[in-house]
Amino acid sequence: MKNFTNNGNLGKFSFLLLSISLFVGFYFNETASGIGAKADFYNYWPWVLDLKDNFYIPGTKYGTLHLPLHYMILSKLNLVFTDTYFLRLFFCFISIFVPFLFYLNLKIKFRSTEENKLWLLASLTFLFPSFRYSSIWANGHITALIFFLLSTLFFLKWLEKRNYETLSLNLILQVIFLSLAVYTRQYYALFFIYLMIVYFQKLKLNTFIKLALVILVLSLPGFWIIYSTPSVLKVTFSKELSTSLLINASIMAFYLIPIFACIFINNRKILNNNKKQLLILTFFSILLVSFLSLLFEYNFKIGGGFFLKLSVMIFKNNFLFYLTSIIGFILLSYLSIEDKNNFILIVILLIGFSAYMIFQKYFEPMFFFIFFLIFNSKLAPEFLKNYKNLLYLYIYVFFYFTSAIINDFLSITANL
């Protein structure tokens, strides 16, 4: 068994097996976590058809605030795959690039880590319900994730080479691909805020100005879209900030809890060395959530994340949800203390995803990627030291995936 894992066979086998499971889900028209992606595919298909004869049509004419790039791509694919079944099947094949690109990113970020572990971690992507149904129903989240991971790939290469004096190809490519992600799903524009701060910290002033001009040129179509269709901004911002903070913290806690738990179980020194910090963070997190809960008002039937629905389903109240929000603030604060740029990105994520409807799919598997690829933390390499951590994470995500399938089949949350 030891020789099997050292050769990387287990990780590659998992990748192959789980990619096959995706096509099994395709065969059965899997709609884990609800029929939203399936409904989107058919509801917006007229938009795709009209884009075959028109370069640009705003999505508002078809009842959506999504930006058009994904649907423009589908319209071109439809010229080749005239049957929607085969178009979806081709898109399902393309979606395998998401976990593969995640693996390529991991190879750069964790040079000294066994490739077998990186394959195993990347393969876990196939079990996230949002990834699966988005792949099966040719959803724009997959297109955006591909562009996002291409951007992070060149971002990590740029950081590794430390070429901060010139406008390198890695710099240009990362902003181009992030721009494409934005034109697919507009909330990816939040990452430009983070990147501009990083660029300002690392680049020479003249290089920073040149790059800013490149980004300005890339953003011109976006400004035109906002001018012609101002309502697209509503997708990414709402005045109910207190509600958004609680939901976002709870959703991010969902992905952080198993990682932190595994690390603390296997390395108690990390916990013992930071007891004072954790106690302070716990105290202030409880105070913050206690205050925000007084202003919390949200219809759990239109999103809110796994823990909110679980809280209502089991306890008929929001107490479990508030507890996970507290845990989320504690863990996010811990990451913020590790690195100031972590703090900046976490604030952007907490505040930026302040939509009037917040779904777990906005963070899945994007936040999982962010933790391992973008955050500067000792916890990620610590987690990857032990195969048991990956096993426990697989069990956690598998139960999550299973619960999503059961919920979809029995319509449990839909009938609450």
Model-identified regions with their sequence ranges:
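Loop-to-helix entry region of an early transmembrane alpha helix in multi-pass inner-membrane enzymes
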Residues: 64, 68, 72, 80-100, ...
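Membrane-lumen/periplasm interface segments of specific transmembrane helices
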Residues: 182, 188, 193-306, 399-411
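Transmembrane signal-anchor helices characteristic of membrane glycosylation enzymes that use polyprenol
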Residues: 9-41, 218-227, 284-294, 350-352, ...
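Specific aromatic-rich, kink-prone transmembrane helix
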Residues: 49, 101, 143-163, 170-178, ...
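Transmembrane-helix motifs of polytopic, lipid-linked glycan transferases
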Residues: 89-112, 150, 154
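Extracytoplasmic catalytic/substrate-binding loops of multi-pass membrane glycan-assembly enzymes
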Residues: 29-47, 61-76, 85, 185, ...
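Membrane-interface alpha helices of multi-pass inner-membrane proteins
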Residues: 122, 168-185, 192-196, 214-220, ...
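Short acidic/glycine- and proline-prone juxtamembrane loop motifs at membrane-interface regions
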Residues: 133-143, 359-360
